[in-house]
Curated annotation (Swiss-Prot):
Its main location: cytoplasm. Its EC number is 2.4.2.17. The lineage of its organism: Bacteria, Pseudomonadati, Pseudomonadota, Betaproteobacteria, Burkholderiales. This is ATP phosphoribosyltransferase. It comes from Paracidovorax citrulli (strain AAC00-1). One of its GO terms (biological process) is L-histidine biosynthetic process. SUPFAM superfamilies: Periplasmic binding protein-like II.
Length: 222
């Protein structure tokens, strides 16, 4: 019989990260038994009674793992940087959910000239740590405008000169007459583990970590 102290809790967010984590779970012999897009449950069972999946916002995954709401989780590098990574063991870059963090502006905005002339830019983003460090390294003066969604609207409405956001194919930027002008960093998703849980549940967690590592090295099918 599985007791609460024996349960391994994995925090995931819906969408691309969830979908691309499934093959890694399969490599560890774990199958999620319900489709998060069809179920209203936030805690999903698996074929292993000692393993469960909790569905949280992408930005909350590191926090759940840090404070023990989950034993481990999968989260983007962008989210980890913004969180700070405190209290987290980060054993693996899983090489899934790849994209990039970039600077984008209106097609008619001369970004290069503005930077060269030392203009102070209004930058809209939810990635304030990444953006601030990037522009500081370039010696560009910026005022940050914290937004949580519909980032593309900011330059179109005059709220901001530029945005810093995740870019995958660039189709959303093009559809909104924006252009990518600088690539800040490449992003992929990482496995994060609660440090206390790794001591208390070392063997079961190590088995999952090792299975993920082997599947990542082999290139688990997406």
């Amino acid at each position: 019989m599985t007791t609460p102290g024996d349960v391994i809790t994995l925090a995931l967010s819906k969408g691309r990260i969830f979908d691309e984590t499934l093959p890694l779970l399969a490599a560890a012999g774990i199958e999620v038994l319900e489709d998060p897009e069809k179920s209203r449950k936030l805690i999903l069972p698996t074929n292993r009674p000692e393993v469960r999946v909790v569905l949280v916002r992408a930005t909350d995954v590191p926090t759940y793992v840090q404070y023990g709401g989950a034993d481990l989780g999968v989260t983007g590098k962008d989210t980890l940087i913004e969180h700070g990574g405190q209290g987290l063991y980060q054993p693996l870059d899983l090489q899934i959910a790849k994209c990039r963090v970039s600077v984008a502006v209106r097609q008619d905005f001369d970004y290069a000239s503005a930077v060269k002339q030392g203009a102070r830019l209004n930058v809209a983003t939810k990635y304030t740590t990444i953006a601030r460090e990037f522009f500081a390294a370039k010696g560009v003066h910026v005022d940050m405008i914290k937004l949580y969604g519909s980032m593309e609207l900011a330059p179109l409405t005059g709220l901001a000169d530029a945005i810093v956001d995740l870019v995958s194919t660039g189709s959303t930027l093009r559809a909104n007459h924006l252009v990518e002008v600088e690539r800040i960093m490449d992003i992929s998703s990482h496995l994060v583990v609660n440090q206390a849980a790794l001591k208390l549940k070392r063997e079961p967690l190590r088995r999952i970590i090792d299975a993920f590592a082997q599947a990542t090295a082999a290139g688990a099918p997406k």
